[in-house]
């Protein structure tokens, strides 16, 4: 029987960069300045948190709100933003802000990173993505600030910013846990429209993707002019939200009023 020849598989440049970002984030989170108790966080906990943030899974082995310091939470937020935008898009932001000229090779890399149909106009598209992301996250934070500032004082400003980024990137991280009540998430705001609706909209807008944004931006509400990908994404998203919401509305939350049941179901 002839021997099978297996080619060595090498990590791609994208994989190396992602692993580098995750590892760097983990090392920063290990530092005493990153934890609320000013202790060194075990490597496996820091690595898990960094991986979860970059890959925007929302899984956590420690409560984000009570375990990490403001510095640690900021690191997590930036890791979420990098993961949500993508490493190449984040790198592009640095190039654009620094005013550096972007080469053809770099433009081609950007095209592959976001699966753009062509290289032409890729910098303009990236700029649109970056500006749109920051604008939407800022608007989301501004809408949530009154509620969070009412409940947490000036700390509410930071909480609004963090939750806006987390929701837009579909990351699932929150800062509402305490030492006595960890991992409570947004349960205390389930029927608060000022938080509930804003978080929902941010999740949806961030989830539908950049190309769907462009279709909506260019063609407004003329659905027939959208690309097939955008049509499928929007239709599927609507069905996946409304159908389970109807089920939850009639199945659960029997002790809530109609309006509160609707908010909790959605």
Where do the model's predicted regions map?
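Membrane-proximal intracellular helices of multi-pass ion channels
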Residues: 1-266
């Amino acid at each position: 029987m002839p021997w099978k020849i297996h080619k060595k598989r090498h990590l791609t440049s994208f994989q190396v960069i992602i692993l580098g970002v995750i590892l760097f984030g983990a090392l920063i989170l290990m530092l005493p300045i990153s934890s609320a108790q000013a202790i060194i966080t075990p490597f496996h906990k820091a690595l898990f948190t960094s991986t979860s943030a970059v890959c925007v899974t929302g899984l956590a082995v420690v409560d984000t709100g009570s375990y990490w310091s403001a510095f640690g939470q900021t690191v997590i937020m930036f890791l979420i933003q990098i993961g949500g935008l993508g490493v190449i898009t984040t790198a592009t932001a640095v190039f654009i802000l620094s005013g550096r000229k972007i080469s053809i090779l770099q433009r081609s890399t950007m095209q592959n990173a976001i699966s753009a149909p062509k290289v032409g106009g890729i910098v303009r598209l990236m700029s649109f993505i970056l500006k749109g992301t920051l604008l939407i996250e800022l608007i989301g934070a501004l809408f949530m600030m009154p509620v969070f500032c009412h409940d947490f004082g000036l700390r509410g400003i930071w909480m609004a910013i963090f939750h806006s980024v987390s929701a837009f990137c579909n990351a699932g991280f929150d800062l509402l846990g305490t030492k006595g009540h960890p991992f409570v998430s947004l349960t205390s705001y389930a029927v608060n429209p000022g938080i509930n609706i804003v978080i929902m909209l941010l999740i949806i807008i961030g989830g539908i993707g950049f190309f769907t944004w462009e279709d909506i931006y260019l063609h407004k509400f003329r659905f027939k002019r959208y690309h097939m990908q955008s049509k499928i994404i929007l239709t599927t998203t609507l069905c996946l939200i409304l159908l389970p919401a109807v089920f939850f509305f009639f199945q659960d939350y029997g002790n809530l009023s109609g309006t509160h049941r609707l908010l909790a179901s959605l």
